[in-house]
Amino acid sequence: MNLYFGDIPICYSHSTAMVLQAAGYDFRSDYLEAIMAMGNGATLVKKDDRHPLVFFDNGMPDESISHCLQILGFDYEEFFCDSSEPVNVIELKEKLKKYLDHGSVIVGPLDMGYLTYNLNYNHLQGVDHFVSVYDMDEDWIYFHDPAGYPCVKMDFRDFCKAWKAEAIDYKRGAYSMWGNLQRNKLPTSQEIYHSVSVIMKQRYENGEVGIIEDYAKTIRANGLNAEQKQLHQFFSFRLAAVRSLYLSQFLKDYDPVRADLKEKIAV
C-alpha cells in the first residue's frame, strides 16, 4: 500500500525530524514515527462505566523521542523536571540557551491551550504538543510548530505556561527538551529493526490487557457519546491508522507477517 502524507498529529515525530535536519541528518517523519513504535495496543485514559475513553497506543511521546534517538545512534542532552517542583524561569532560559548553542532543540510536551497564536487554542486545553525551537533572545522564543505555524515568535514567559504542561498526565515531567544531538554510532537496518522489536514486545507485555475488547463491549451496550465520537473521528482513528501504516512499511523487509497485520489494522 502507498504511504500517506498529510495532516496527521504526529508533532513529536515532525519536531524530531526538523531538529535532526537542522543538525544535518535527513530522516522522514514517517520513518521516525515507526521507530517510536507508539501505535501498539491501547490505553484507558478515562474510566467511566458507560462511556470510557481509550487511546490506541501504549507509549508516551517524550519517552519515545529518547528511544528513537538512542536507536538511531545519537548521543544527546535531555532535561525534564517534576511538575510539582518550582522552576526558576531564568535558570530554565539559560539551560535552553546552552542547548541552542549546539543547534535546534526538541521541546515538549506543551499544553496547546496556552499557544495563543493558534486560533483554536481555547478548545485545546490539556492537548499535548511538541515543537522545534531554533532561537531565543532576552524576551522571545522562536520555533517551528508542526501544526501549521512556521517561524513562530512568542514571549518566553507565556511559552513557559505551555511548557509546564500541568494539565497533561502522559509525560515524564515538565519543561522537557532534547538538544546537542551527535550521531556517534551508525546502526545497521537490522540492528534498528531489532531495537524497535524489543520496544514493541516490552510495550505489549507491560500494557493493560483486554482494553479494546472491553471497550467494544461497552460501545455495543451504551453507544458512543459526543466526546467519544469527537475523539475518534478527529484524532484517534486517523492517528492509529497512519501509525499502523508507517509501522507496516518499516516491518515489511524484516517481518512480512506483522507488516501485513499492521496494514490490515490501518484499513
Each PLM stretch: what is its role?
Residues A22, I35, C68, K95, ...:
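Residues that form generic nucleotide/phosphate-binding pockets
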Residues Y25-K46, H51-D57, P86-M136, H144:
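Active-site-adjacent substructure of cysteine-protease-like catalytic cores
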Residues C11, Q125, S236:
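Short, contiguous, pocket-lining structural segments
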Residues S248-Q249, D253-V267:
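Long, low-complexity C-terminal extensions of enzymes
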Residues S15, Y31, S64-H67, E91, ...:
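Exposed alpha-helical structural elements
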Residues E138-V242, L247-D253:
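Noncatalytic regulatory segments and standalone regulatory/sensor domains
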Residues M1-V89, L181-Q182, P187, I192:
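Cysteine-nucleophile protease catalytic domains, especially the papain-like/related folds used
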Residues F5-G6, F55, H123, Q230, ...:
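Short, charged/polar micro-motifs that form catalytic or ligand-binding hotspots
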